[in-house]
Amino acid sequence: MTDGKLSTSTNGVAFMGILDGRPGNPLQNLQHVNLKAPRLLSAPEYGPKLKLRALEDRHSLQSVDSGIPTLEIGNPEPVPCSAVHVRRKQSDSDLIPERAFQSACALPSCAPPAPSSTEREQSVRKSSTFPRTGYDSVKLYSPTSKALTRSDDVSVCSVSSLGTELSTTLSVSNEDILDLVVTSSSSAIVTLENDDDPQFTNVTLSSIKETRGLHQQDCVHEAEEGSKLKILGPFSNFFARNLLARKQSARLDKHNDLGWKLFGKAPLRENAQKDSKRIQKEYEDKAGRPSKPPSPKQNVRKNLDFEPLSTTALILEDRPANLPAKPAEEAQKHRQQYEEMVVQAKKRELKEAQRRKKQLEERCRVEESIGNAVLTWNNEILPNWETMWCSRKVRDLWWQGIPPSVRGKVWSLAIGNELNITHELFDICLARAKERWRSLSTGGSEVENEDAGFSAADREASLELIKLDISRTFPNLCIFQQGGPYHDMLHSILGAYTCYRPDVGYVQGMSFIAAVLILNLDTADAFIAFSNLLNKPCQMAFFRVDHGLMLTYFAAFEVFFEENLPKLFAHFKKNNLTPDIYLIDWIFTLYSKSLPLDLACRIWDVFCRDGEEFLFRTALGILKLFEDILTKMDFIHMAQFLTRLPEDLPAEELFASIATIQMQSRNKKWAQVLTALQKDSREMEKGSPSLRH
């Protein structure tokens, strides 16, 4: 006996005659069911669950898929019966609506044959589980064979789990009787045919799109099992039928008509695949503006034409077909906003292009002037240095900046070599410095005769200070630090100088001067220029920390400060801002630490020509450039600003400001004022005993 619950999307169907069926596997042993017996097919309306007879299937299981009620057809113990029957329980007639049986289909009937003893001994097994809905449920049972009517063949389909993705199609059919098909997106199809020796064919579980292919695979599989198909007799050709082909194609056509497909393989509408250029062209055609022909050089933009990109696609793109159309007023408003955005973008791009064009023109002009200057320096000035270096033409070229390719050579010639240092002397000083480093690292106490006046502690302190200062020299370049390409060269020059001038030793700030020389000269030539540069009166006064001479330089600076910038000078005096607060760092490093490197090199160019006077003239030029800002600051902010100048200080503006500074006071030049102050300082020291200490 086979019991079960089954419901469709429209009617509940009571049926029987299903054997052991599992999705994906052939169902066997259909011969245990007597399909010749009369059967009754009834379909009640939607309603509550029908109470049937007490002989219920105790083996039916609930589905494991989210509590979906299932049709459980398992493999219980054999139940002997002579036929398979469907009958309504008499005791529950009042509980079942009468209209539930008014739509029952009366199938063609005939006199049922008497069941044989063999048929009574045969057993019926329950089939596997099929999903179904929770709308209706019908109990299937078979009490006796007398309550059944005759029906040669039956085709029953139940399906449609409306709340889930899976549904079931159970088919028991032949060619001339009822054939019902109810499906959803996925279905499990069981096809059953009865004949003298009925059998199940196959069970498949697939989606609606795969049903057609699976039916064909089933037919191929059945063709291989020829012996089983021969048993089915004239009904075997029914297996080639595709019950879902019509619905399948209809649904696919319906999906393809839609423009938006979220979950599927249907292609989007053609409008969604337009690119921005095509949309822009269509917009220009609608607006009546002729589109420009494509340029042969598409990568080169001529006349700074603006090409809208993502903005065009966002604003001018039509709405999807499933959304309401954009009102005309809103569309016009968006079009106006789009045109305004394009105009603003054109203005910004035009302004940026003009700025870039100006920068490019300036760069080309500078490069061209540098190229011409290199030819002039190499062909005219350097071969005739002694006669041309003080000429008006050379001085003008000097003010504009020395080309980097000849800068080192010009610096060497301008600084000179009054100390007569040779490359051999540099090698001797370097070897002595390396020996001293080794002796200090091994803890040796050997002191040479010429260094007897300097303790080992002073030498060790100088070496440690060199090591510390090198790590802080142009840290942004990362070429003088440990492991950098110029670290050893800088270390060698500073170490050799401490051996060459032990009376001076190493002073903070020397590393920046030596680093700038290394960037433009070879190691030996850089050492020669470094030693002669530090031997100048101003540098020697500062590096030897000659306090009296330093004050004299500061006093001379204030004379020209008051002459050129009286308003700012009075403001500095009012706030007690003395020159030593900002001048010491500028003079010690020759502006290489305070200004950008390329700007500092230009200052070095003129410094090599004009000497120490240009260092103080440059200081006055910086003060004049920022005069308006400094006059609004107090003492603290002025000191902070001058000790840390802006990094983007423009070179041309600075040199224009320096050019306005007149290094003449009361018809006296820098050297005359400095000499007079030095003379006065000596006289004051002689006349005032307090100044001697």
UniProtKB/Swiss-Prot annotation:
Transmembrane parts of this sequence = none
Q: Which domain of life is it from?
A: Eukaryota
- Which GO MF term does the entry hold, naming one? protein kinase binding
Q: Which GO terms describe its biological process?
A: autophagy; negative regulation of autophagy; recycling endosome to Golgi transport; regulation of autophagosome assembly
UniProt keywords (A-Z) are: Autophagy, Golgi apparatus, GTPase activation, Phosphoprotein
**Biased composition, class Basic and acidic residues, residue ranges:** 271-288
Keyword check for NAD: no
User: What is any Pfam family matched here?
Assistant: RabGAP-TBC
The species is Homo sapiens (Human)
- Fetch the SUPFAM superfamilies from UniProt: Ypt/Rab-GAP domain of gyp1p
Reply yes or no: does the keyword Phosphoprotein apply.
yes
Purpose of the protein: Plays a role in the regulation of starvation-induced autophagosome formation. Together with the TRAPPIII complex, regulates a constitutive trafficking step from peripheral recycling endosomes to the early Golgi, maintaining the cycling pool of ATG9 required for initiation of autophagy.
Rab-GAP TBC domain: from which residue to which, for each copy?
A: 401-611
Q: What is this protein called?
A: TBC1 domain family member 14
Task: Map out region (Disordered) in residue numbers.
Answer: 108-130, 271-304
Q: Name one GO cellular component term.
A: Golgi apparatus
Compartment(s) where it occurs, according to its Swiss-Prot or TrEMBL record: Golgi apparatus, cis-Golgi network; Golgi apparatus, trans-Golgi network
Q: What is its main location?
A: Golgi
Annotated positions of the Phosphoserine modification: S91, S295
Instruction: State how it assembles.
Output: Interacts with ULK1. May interact with RAB11A and RAB11B, but does not exhibit any GTPase-activating activity toward these proteins. Interacts with TRAPPC8.
